């Protein structure tokens, strides 16, 4: 677990897009000094009267590419403030649909770093030489928040920052709150969180599951685990397929069997450990 304040720097041509970082849990974390966010306008490092940050791509093609000079000068300026080259220095986060998937596991990894610098791009992206240059100085994470394309990377910055910030010590009111999150490391790795309920116990003729009123912690834990398995098999079967059988106990395997999932020895070399009966017949 990390200690101290997490520093976040964001270089963007739309600083106002980052306003949501002033509200909710992230805003409170900033007010308490757990999160130190600096947003920088990339155009402050342009030197022509049009504040140009993009140009046509070499090799032709549609769209524009963000220029090396503004990005290089901006990052040099940001990094000059407290820059270190060891593990305690910054990591560069490049939001891009061509990056590695952003996962809860990666959020945990980033939450243990002291300093994150984001480069949300627009247009067709940033000239590749910028990324390659800073990769020689610090860890670079090219990260995608999904298999779709946005107009720019600022929305991804908001997503990643919130996912990371809520993992910082003291940000959540209850330190155990994220233990049972979907994808949380440990027992919930590769599983989606099941349904949750609160008062009143009955609403419009719909009652909460009786087990939740039983006070029996073991039965409640088993029910929650079964509901997580049900939801994951229904909504994200790909997650179940690649779960190592050793991650499941006897009761987990019984529930998976009821749901129509069985070990798939033939799939192990391909990273697939489970299959549904209909898939096994194909």
Swiss-Prot record:
Listed GO MF terms: tRNA (guanine(37)-N1)-methyltransferase activity
Keyword Cytoplasm applies: yes
Pfam families (alphabetical): tRNA_m1G_MT
Top-level EC class: transferase
Main location per the UniProt record: cytoplasm
InterPro entries membership: Alpha/beta_knot_MTases, tRNA_m1G_MeTrfase_C_sf, tRNA_m1G_MeTrfase_TrmD, tRNA_m1G_MTases_N, tRNA_MeTrfase_TRMD/TRM10
This protein's GO CC annotations: cytosol
Domain of life: Bacteria
Cytoplasm listed as a keyword: yes
Residues bound to S-adenosyl-L-methionine: 145-150
Catalyzed reaction equations: guanosine(37) in tRNA + S-adenosyl-L-methionine = N(1)-methylguanosine(37) in tRNA + S-adenosyl-L-homocysteine + H(+)
Record-listed E.C. numbers: 2.1.1.228
Localization, UniProt: Cytoplasm
One GO-annotated biological process of the protein: tRNA N1-guanine methylation
SUPFAM superfamilies cross-referenced by the UniProt entry: alpha/beta knot
Keywords tagged on the record: Cytoplasm, Methyltransferase, S-adenosyl-L-methionine, Transferase, tRNA processing
Subunit field text: Homodimer.
Similarity comment: family membership: Belongs to the RNA methyltransferase TrmD family.
Its job: Specifically methylates guanosine-37 in various tRNAs.
Annotated HAMAP family: TrmD
Designated name of the protein: tRNA (guanine-N(1)-)-methyltransferase
Name of the gene: trmD
């Amino acid at each position: 677990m990390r200690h101290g304040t997490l520093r976040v720097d964001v270089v963007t041509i739309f600083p106002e897009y980052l306003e949501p970082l002033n509200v909710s849990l992230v805003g409170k974390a900033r007010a308490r000094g757990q999160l130190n966010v600096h947003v920088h306008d990339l155009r402050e490092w342009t030197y022509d009267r049009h504040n140009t940050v993009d140009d046509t791509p070499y090799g032709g093609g549609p769209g524009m590419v963000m220029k090396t000079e503004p990005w290089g000068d901006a990052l040099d300026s940001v990094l000059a403030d407290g820059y270190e080259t060891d593990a305690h220095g910054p990591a560069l986060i490049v939001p891009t649909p061509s990056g590695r998937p952003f996962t809860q596991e990666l959020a945990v990894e980033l939450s243990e770093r002291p300093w994150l610098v984001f480069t949300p791009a627009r247009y067709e992206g940033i000239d590749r030489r910028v990324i390659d240059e800073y990769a020689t100085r610090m860890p670079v994470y090219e990260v995608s928040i999904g298999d779709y394309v946005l107009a720019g990377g600022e929305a991804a910055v908001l997503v990643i920052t919130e996912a990371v910030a809520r993992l910082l010590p003291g940000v959540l009111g209850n330190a155990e709150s994220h233990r049972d999150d979907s994808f949380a490391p440990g027992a919930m790795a590769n599983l989606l969180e099941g349904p949750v309920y609160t008062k009143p116990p009955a609403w419009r003729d719909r009652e909460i599951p009786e087990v939740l009123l039983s006070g029996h912690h073991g039965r409640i834990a088993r029910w929650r685990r079964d509901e997580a398995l049900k939801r994951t098999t229904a909504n994200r079967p790909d997650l179940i397929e690649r779960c190592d059988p050793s991650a499941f106990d006897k009761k987990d395997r019984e529930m998976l069997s009821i749901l129509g999932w069985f070990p798939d020895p033939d799939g192990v070399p391909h990273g697939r450990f489970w299959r549904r009966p209909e898939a096994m017949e194909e």
